[in-house]
Regions:
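Class I S-adenosyl-L-methionine-dependent methyltransferase catalytic core
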Residues: 1-126
């Protein structure tokens, strides 16, 4: 059955990532109804009572460890302050960064992404 327009939304700070996502979602039945925009997570309106799935930058995509730790802390603050009532599933290519988010995990699962032996982590915001 057709996917209602805008039911699933995605964003990224990188236009290249958005273009790749458009190609991939275009292959899905109903994928044309997925709304993708170039936008940093910091610029999103509050996300209340939704499910968030994300693959934030990590080692390969960011250069310095300090930058990654700071990014993850800021991302954790965003989840806590602007995503009340939501569930967030976050992929970590570098397991050491999980603690940098500063939130308690509901669960962690091993998940390979190509050669990366990462973790999918669930957070529940209250």
């Amino acid at each position: 059955r057709p996917l209602p327009e805008g039911l699933i939304r995605g964003s990224d700070a990188s236009m290249r990532a958005i273009e790749a996502a458009r190609v991939n979602t275009g292959r899905l039945l109903g994928g044309k109804g997925i709304v993708l925009t170039k936008r940093r997570y910091q610029d999103l309106h509050p996300l209340r009572d939704v499910t968030i799935v994300c693959n934030p930058p990590y080692g390969i995509r960011m250069k310095r460890e300090q930058d990654m730790v700071r990014f993850m802390k800021d991302f954790g603050d965003f989840l806590k302050q602007r995503c009340q009532g939501s569930k967030a599933y976050v992929y970590f290519g570098d397991r050491a960064l999980i603690k940098s988010v500063g939130l308690r995990t509901s669960w962690k699962r091993p998940l390979k992404n190509g050669p990366l032996d990462g973790r999918l982590v669930k957070y529940e915001m209250y």
